[in-house]
Amino acid sequence: GKITFYEDRNFQGRCYECSTDCPDLSPYFS
């Protein structure tokens, strides 16, 4: 489901690594 959408390198690289900048995505990755 959601993992497929965040599979993009550009998106994942910024929000996945910098969870502080994207707190909204924090619950999706945790």
From Swiss-Prot:
GO terms for molecular function: structural constituent of eye lens. One of its GO terms (biological process) is lens development in camera-type eye. Residues 1-30 form the Beta/gamma crystallin 'Greek key' domain. It comes from the Eukaryota. Keywords: Eye lens protein, Repeat. It holds the Pfam family Crystall. Has a two-domain beta-structure, folded into four very similar Greek key motifs. Monomer. This is Gamma-II crystallin.
